[in-house]
From Swiss-Prot:
The keyword Cell membrane applies. It comes from the Bacteria. One of its GO terms (biological process) is sodium-dependent phosphate transport. This is Uncharacterized protein YqeW. GO terms for cellular component: plasma membrane. The chain crosses the membrane at residues 1-21, 52-72, 99-119, 133-153, 174-194, 208-228, 242-262, 277-297. It comes from Bacillus subtilis (strain 168). It is a multi-pass membrane protein. One of its GO terms (molecular function) is sodium:phosphate symporter activity. NCBIfam families: Na_Pi_symport, NaPi_cotrn_rel. InterPro entries: Na/Pi_transpt, NaPi_cotrn-rel/YqeW-like.
Length: 307
C-alpha cells in the first residue's frame, strides 16, 4: 500500500512540477501568449512552426489544444487553420520528453535550492526563473523516485499484472499507454514513468515504443473534453487531433518491430532511446500529413459535418 501511495504522490508532484515550469516559462516569455498566437495562423507552415514553439513553452500539447479549442469556440479561429497547429503541437510536446531523458540527478538539489532562493527574491525575472527551476527540480526528483519504485512495484500483484500485459504484446502495451495517459492527462508523466522502468530493464524497447504510441492517442482526451460544450468547429478540431494521432499510430505500428533495431542505435541510454523515438515519430508523421491539410480538412468534415 505504501508503495502505491508513494507512486501516486510522485505522479501528483510531477504534474505540479510541470505546472510550475510552465508558469515560469510563460511569465518570462510572453505576457499575452494567446493573443500573440493568433498572429501566426494565416499560413499553414507558420501555424505549424509557431505551435511547436508555443507547445514547447507550455510544456503540454493538452494545454495548447485547450487554448486552440477556446479560440475556435469563440469564433476567432477557423477549424481549417487549426490543422497545421495540431501537427505542430505533437512535435512540440516531445521537447519535454527529450529534456527529462537527460541524466540530471546530481543537479536536482541545485535546481531546488537555487529555484527557491530566486523565487524568494520576489523580483522579475528572478522570481519567474525560480519558479521554472523549482518545477524542473521537482520533475527530475520524481523521475528519480519512479526509478527507485520500479522494482518494488513489479512485486505487487497489480504492478506485475500491468507489466505482464505491457510485455505480452504491442497491442496491450499501446492500450495501457493510451489509458494511463488519458487518466492522468499527461503524456509526459506517462513517458517519464516508462523511462524509469526502462532504465531498470523491466520493459523491453519494442513494448516501450508501443506505450509511447498509445500515449500519443491518450493525450487527445483533454482536447475532446474541452470541446464537449463547444460548437461543431470546436468538436471538429478536437476530433481532428484524435484522427491524426490514430492515423499516425496506424501507419507506424505494423513496422514497430522492424524499427526497433534502428531505435536501438540512437543512444546507449534506454530513456533517450524512447525520447528520440517519440521525437522521430511525431516529426515524421507531421511532415507526412502537413502537405495533406486540405485533404485532412475534408476528411474531418465528412466524419463530423457542420450543421
Amino acid at each position: 500500500m505504501l508503495i502505491l501511495i508513494s507512486f501516486t504522490a510522485l505522479i501528483l508532484f510531477f504534474l505540479a512540477g510541470m505546472n510550475m515550469l510552465r508558469k515560469g516559462l510563460i511569465s518570462m516569455a510572453y505576457s499575452k501568449i494567446e493573443e500573440r498566437l493568433l498572429l501566426f495562423t494565416d499560413h499553414p507552415l507558420k501555424a505549424f512552426l509557431i505551435s511547436i514553439v508555443f507547445t514547447g513553452i507550455l510544456q503540454s500539447s493538452s494545454a495548447f489544444m485547450v487554448i486552440v479549442i477556446g479560440f475556435v469556440s469563440a469564433g476567432v479561429l477557423s477549424f481549417k487553420r487549426t490543422i497545421p497547429m495540431i501537427l505542430g503541437t505533437n512535435v512540440g510536446s516531445t521537447f519535454t520528453t527529450e529534456f527529462i531523458a537527460i541524466k540530471m540527478d546530481i543537479v536536482i538539489w541545485v535546481l531546488l535550492i537555487g529555484g527557491l532562493l530566486f523565487f524568494l527574491t520576489g523580483r522579475y525575472p528572478l522570481k519567474q526563473l525560480g519558479t521554472s527551476f523549482l518545477g524542473l527540480g521537482i520533475i527530475f526528483f520524481c523521475i528519480s523516485g519512479f526509478s527507485h519504485l520500479a522494482g518494488p512495484l513489479t512485486k505487487l500483484k497489480t504492478g506485475a499484472d500491468v507489466l505482464y500485459h505491457v510485455n505480452d504484446s504491442n497491442w496491450s502495451a499501446l492500450l495501457i499507454g493510451m489509458v494511463l495517459t488519458a487518466i492522468i492527462h499527461s503524456s509526459s508523466v506517462c513517458i517519464g514513468i516508462l523511462m524509469s522502468f526502462m532504465n531498470e530493464g523491466i520493459i523491453g524497447l519494442t513494448q516501450a515504443m508501443s506505450v509511447v504510441l498509445g500515449s500519443n492517442i491518450g493525450t487527445c482526451i483533454t482536447a475532446v473534453m474541452a470541446a464537449v460544450s463547444g460548437g461543431y468547429a470546436a468538436k471538429q478540431t478536437a476530433y481532428a487531433h484524435v484522427v491524426f494521432n490514430v492515423l499516425g499510430v496506424a501507419l507506424v505500428l505494423p513496422f514497430l518491430t522492424a524499427a526497433t533495431g534502428f531505435v536501438e542505435q540512437l543512444s546507449p541510454d534506454p530513456a533517450q532511446k524512447i525520447a528520440h523515438f517519440s521525437l522521430l515519430f511525431n516529426v515524421v508523421t507531421a511532415l507526412l500529413f502537413l502537405p495533406l491539410t486540405n485533404l485532412f480538412y475534408r476528411l474531418i468534415h465528412l466524419l463530423i459535418p457542420a450543421k
